Amino acid sequence: MSQTLLVEDLHKRFGSGRRLVWANDGITMSVNAGEVVGLLGHNGAGKTTLVNQIVGLYRPYSGRIAVDGVDVVADPAAARRLVSVQAQENVPITGISPRKAVELVGRIRGGRRSAMRQRAKGLIDALDMGEWADRPAEKVSGGVARLSAFAMAVARPGALVVLDEPTNDVDPVRRQLLWDEVRRVADDGAAVLLVTHNVREAERAVDSLVLLDHGKILTKGTTASVVSEFGGGFRLDVDVARGAVPAFPDGWGVHRHDAAHWSVSVPEGGGVEAAEWATHARAAGQIVRYELGPVSLEEVYVALTTEADGTRAA
């Protein structure tokens, strides 16, 4: 796969003196054609600042950004030709329908009228938004407006597609349809950068990810590699019987949410032992319910950001 986006040692700062803040601090990452990469981080992690530099709205303090081989720091206008963006906030559309808006954006980006008419129809059908496609855009719901913004971004995608929180306000059924369409866009050859703070959702949608915290990359790689490196093992959730105090094997980490609900971290390779322990504990009346599964990306992310915050505080 060819490398569509390359970010090298990127720094961006705001303010000065005691108010100096490094919004991006040494960011290096890439996105290949045909790949969906998740840029994950909480509010204030530096995601939007990074995106604004990629699309040419901000100039870095130092570092390099190339899109499809073009230095977009030296030529920010090229970024607007090469990158298709769904911004975090919907751009207000008035006077036309979602269908016409999608067709118009496709034509602005160089598509032929007939081809963009077919493309708009295909996207509207794929996202199941035909009921609202020909209504005035200013009168549709927030979820439909969000779907419309996504369809506009991918009507005639550039080499790089940046999607900033694309599923905000979208209902669960159409959210899955949107993710299916994201995959099709990548399969057709575009590089996709998905910006989100919803770790659980991103875990199902991306090929690889970059975890950002306070302007720095905590880790990057495939979901499986990140979980394996920093997590691994299993999580056992149990509902404890009234008055019971179950005894857990050595090496298991126990967190009591309250008297009845406990979470237990089980070391890697301990899945069978955990299942056997839970079965016996339930038969003995110590617990009334249990759920066992692998450690999730969300849990790894929370642990990494908590550890990083603790290190800074120290």
Tell where the protein language model's regions lie, with residue ranges:
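Walker A (P-loop) phosphate-binding loop of ABC-type ATPase nucleotide-binding domains
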Residues: H42-G46
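Helix-to-loop junction immediately C-terminal to a conserved catalytic motif
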Residues: V55
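Conserved ABC transporter NBD signature motif
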Residues: G63-A74, A78-A79
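Conserved ABC ATPase "signature" region
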Residues: E103, R107, A115-W132
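ABC ATPase C-loop
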Residues: A153-V154
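Catalytic Walker B motif of ABC-type/P-loop ATPase nucleotide-binding domains
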Residues: V161-E165
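ABC transporter nucleotide-binding domain
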Residues: W179-P267
